[in-house]
Amino acid sequence: MEKPVVLGTLGTVYGIKGWLKVNSFTDVAEAIFDYNPWMINQNGVWRELKVSAWKRHNKGLICKIDGIDLREDALALTNVEIGVPADLLPALPEGEFYWRDLIGCSVSTTKGYDLGKVTELMETGSNDVLVVEANVKDAFGAKERLIPFLEEQVIKHIDLTARTIEVDWDPGF
């Protein structure tokens, strides 16, 4: 089985009837409940569980899991990852990408300089940022580069099949 895509985590227990707080990583927090059942990662093992109810609470979300009716039972589920199979994610329009698809891509400049590989992405408010781990023998001594994900301005071409990203970026920066 392919590793599920992590969409959030279960947080602390809420109340005495087995409800749990939910930390959603989806753009619209409630969208995490569009997927049911969930896969959860407990001690490195993914298993399925069903959400029987959910609601907004204050500024967050809480949920009820099938078969979990006591606070003590819910404690075993705190701080576990919530995932779904990748094939359940909606298809994106042309030119849009899931972050998970960009991680691991090789990044090079339009002049052919190999900058390294994408290790993560950051959301900054104004635009997303590629975190690129530099090659061990980088001529500029860089360990990591932060490259703004600005299509057309900086990002020139993305080829997910070849796992490459071409950027207009000064390697010394």
Curated annotation (Swiss-Prot):
Its main location: cytoplasm. GO terms for cellular component: cytoplasm; ribosome. An accessory protein needed during the final step in the assembly of 30S ribosomal subunit, possibly for assembly of the head region. Essential for efficient processing of 16S rRNA. May be needed both before and after RbfA during the maturation of 16S rRNA. It has affinity for free ribosomal 30S subunits but not for 70S ribosomes. It comes from Aeromonas salmonicida (strain A449). Belongs to the RimM family. This is Ribosome maturation factor RimM. The gene is rimM. Keywords: Chaperone, Cytoplasm, Ribosome biogenesis, rRNA processing. InterPro entries: PRC_barrel-like_sf, PRC_RimM, RimM, RimM_N, RimM_N_sf, Transl_B-barrel_sf. Gene3D superfamilies: PRC-barrel domain, RimM. It comes from the Bacteria. One of its GO terms (molecular function) is ribosome binding. It holds the Pfam family PRC_RimM. Residues 94-173 form the PRC barrel domain.
